[in-house]
C-alpha cells in the first residue's frame, strides 16, 4: 500500500 511505499522510501533514506 501507500504506507508500505513510504516506509520503503524512509528506509532507503536511512531514516
From Swiss-Prot:
**Top-level lineage group:** Eukaryota
Q: Which residues carry this modification: Leucine amide?
A: 15
Example GO BP: defense response
Q: What's in the keyword line of the UniProt record?
A: Amidation, Amphibian defense peptide, Secreted
Q: Which residues form a coiled coil?
A: none
Its GO CC terms are: extracellular region
Give expression by tissue. Answer: Expressed by the skin parotoid and/or rostral glands.
Where found, per UniProt? Secreted
UniProt key word Disulfide bond: no
| Predominant subcellular localization, coarse grouping | secreted
- Could you tell me what this protein does? Caeridins show neither neuropeptide activity nor antibiotic activity.
Q: What is this protein called?
A: Caeridin-4
From which organism does this entry originate?
Answer: Ranoidea caerulea
Which taxonomic lineage is given here? Answer: Eukaryota, Metazoa, Chordata, Craniata, Vertebrata
Amino acid at each position: 500500500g501507500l504506507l508500505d511505499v513510504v516506509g520503503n522510501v524512509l528506509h532507503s533514506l536511512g531514516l
